[in-house]
A protein has these predicted regions:
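Acidic catalytic loop of the alpha/beta-hydrolase fold
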Residues: 84-85, 113
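Redox-cofactor binding/interface segments in oxidoreductases and associated redox assembly factors
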Residues: 78-79, 107
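N-terminal beta1-alpha1-beta2 submodule of the flavodoxin-like/Rossmannoid cofactor-binding fold
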Residues: 1-78, 85-87, 92-96, 145-156
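Glycine-centered flexibility sites
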Residues: 13, 79, 102, 112-117
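Short, conserved loop/helix-junction motifs that constitute active-site signature segments
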Residues: 96-102, 125-127
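Short, glycine-/small-residue-rich phosphate/pyrophosphate-handling segment
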Residues: 106-143
Length: 156
């Protein structure tokens, strides 16, 4: 079995819960993608920081710390909340911080009603040479069994 990492960004705690359950369910290591400048509730307003970042394709919010041993992982699950039908721009920052050539990247997201939208289309340029699989959206009630069953369908 390949070595797996679950890396996630969570603004409200929902994605963190799903990421922890996923890592537990599949025996993966876990890493929280933390912004250098944490998001506040006010930053998530449609007229605030998150919208400004999401409106600028060149924006790359800084990450507080990198995962030192990323080379050890063959498969990286990347979790995030859906913002405006795509991944938050900080996910692009994370992916672009490493050479992911030859790795399998699997996005997963949390949302109260959105699907993955154009997530893969927006993430693909940030992980050249990696195999980017189509992801899935989960809600806060997703169990370890649900997550494990999803991973089984990926035939990793």
């Amino acid at each position: 079995m390949s070595k797996r990492l679950v890396a996630y960004f969570s603004a409200s705690g929902v994605t963190a819960k799903v990421a922890e359950n996923l890592a537990d369910a599949i025996g993966a290591d876990i890493f929280e993608i933390q912004p250098e400048v944490p998001y506040t509730k006010a930053d998530l307003n449609k007229k605030a920081r998150s919208t400004i970042e999401m409106s600028d394709p060149a924006s790359r919010p800084a990450i507080a710390a990198k995962r030192d041993n990323i080379d050890e992982y063959d498969t990286i699950f990347v979790g995030f909340p859906i913002w405006w039908y795509v991944a938050p721009i900080i996910i692009n920052t994370f992916l672009e911080s490493y050479n992911l050539k030859g790795k399998t990247i699997i996005p997963f997201a949390t949302s109260g009603g959105s699907d993955m939208g154009k997530t893969n289309e927006n993430l693909a340029p940030s992980c050249p040479g990696a195999k980017l699989l189509h992801g899935k959206v989960f809600n806060s009630y997703s169990s370890k069994a649900d997550l494990s069953a999803w991973v089984e369908t990926l035939s990793l």
